[in-house]
């Protein structure tokens, strides 16, 4: 994609190395082929970061906010990306990491993973995010003893981007917009934690807003 190509260029321009490996989170075959390539060409991952998002549900009109109006196929897509997809990525990547005895498996999540809430107009369909959090908890219990640091990272706010800056709230409350660099620092902090003091859930919230619970 254009975003991946731009990121690849930026990394290489700074003297780094990177590859773009596309996969479809709704396809087990696609995920397996992607990790087969990674393991064959680049070796066992040191870290796997799941950061897949989706827009499903944002265009539902205000008079159709109730669950009864939500198409089943919309729910299926959200479930694929938020729960089934991460499950398949874990299956494809963790066996080799377990045998290696080290690594981190970090999941980007949001506040909807903490408790069920009524969906507001313009929001994506976030019900399956609860299952993503549960997956992180299960993997923590199963793989910590094998040297794999699993963490669920709750990004509790709007991340700075051209699209986010165009929103009215960004003009009224710029202090509520989250820095991507600061979020990346938090992920790196998790990845480099000493194994005697692992954090398994981290919530990132702008100072000017109340944390979601």
Predicted feature residues:
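C-terminal helical subdomain
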Residues: 145-154, 166-213
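Catalytic loop of short-chain dehydrogenase/reductase
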Residues: 54, 72-74, 78, 104-131, ...
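The beta1-alpha1 cofactor-binding region of Rossmann-like NAD(H)/NADP(H)-dependent oxidoreductases
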Residues: 22-34
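A short helix-coil junction within the Rossmann-fold of NAD(P)-dependent oxidoreductases
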Residues: 41-42, 55-59, 92-101
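Catalytic Tyr-X3-Lys loop
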Residues: 46, 68-87, 106
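Rossmann-fold scaffold of SDR-type NAD(P)-dependent oxidoreductases
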Residues: 45-60, 82, 107, 151
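A glycine-rich helix->loop->beta "capping" turn
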Residues: 14-19, 37-50, 56, 71
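Amphipathic alpha-helical dimer-interface segment in Rossmann-like NAD(P)H-dependent oxidoreductases
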Residues: 36, 77-99
């Amino acid at each position: 994609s254009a975003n991946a190509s731009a990121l690849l260029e930026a990394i290489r321009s700074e003297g780094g190395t990177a590859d773009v490996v596309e996969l479809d989170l709704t396809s087990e075959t696609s995920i397996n082929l992607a990790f087969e390539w990674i393991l064959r060409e680049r070796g066992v991952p040191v870290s796997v970061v799941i950061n897949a998002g989706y827009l499903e549900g944002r265009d539902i009109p205000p008079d159709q906010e109730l669950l009864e109006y939500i198409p089943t196929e919309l729910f299926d897509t959200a479930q694929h990306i938020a729960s089934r997809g991460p499950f398949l990525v874990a299956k494809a990547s963790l066996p080799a990491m377990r045998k290696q005895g080290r690594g981190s498996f970090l999941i980007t999540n949001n506040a909807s993973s903490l408790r069920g809430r009524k969906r507001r107009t313009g929001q994506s369909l976030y019900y399956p995010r609860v299952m993503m959090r549960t997956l992180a908890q299960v993997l923590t219990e199963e793989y910590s003893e094998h040297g794999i640091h699993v963490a669920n990272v709750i990004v509790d706010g709007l991340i700075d981007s051209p699209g986010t800056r165009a929103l009215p709230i960004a003009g009224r409350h710029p202090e509520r917009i989250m820095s991507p660099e600061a979020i990346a620092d938090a992920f790196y902090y998790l990845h480099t934690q000493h194994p005697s003091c692992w954090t398994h859930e981290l919530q990132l919230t702008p100072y000017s807003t109340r944390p979601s619970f």
